[in-house]
Amino acid sequence: MKMNSKFKPLGYIVYEGPSLLDGSPIVIIINKIKAASKNAKTGALVQSFIIRSDINPVEALKTGADAAICGHCIHRPSLAAYTGAPPCYVNVGRSVLMVYNAYKRGRYVKASPNEVAHYLTGLKLRIGTYGDGAAAPVTIWQQLTQFTADHVGYSHQWLNPSFDHAAWSKLVMASADTIDEAIT
């Protein structure tokens, strides 16, 4: 992805590669660095979007191609329609689509996770504003969080037998959908 030189970058691309959930192409974009927040609950959090790099996120959601970034989360609309679970609360047609469109227009700069980690010094990072952090290598997130004041994230992948609990437990909490899951 070539940076459009007419514009100031909106954020950083820290990973472009295969999804660890299904092998499809994904991208991780870090943005909202130094941005103020109106969210009284979380305060200012640097945002991270895990999205398909080859498909508009609304289309990915409609076709089930969002499995690359959400795995078997029961809140994916394509699964929620069958299970009766409430669909994901993220409005993909707004912020996620805006991030994807900016990515396609070249508004984000490629940078290593270690480089971006320095920009995040003393800040709080949200792992997976959209998408599950476990779609990408855990080392990406370990590098990004090395200087942060704090980070928050959830993963539905913790029930997957290949999920590295030891590595991920320092980064994300299990996203539990039932009381039984929560006490597991």
Language-model segment annotations:
Residues 1-184:
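Class I S-adenosyl-L-methionine
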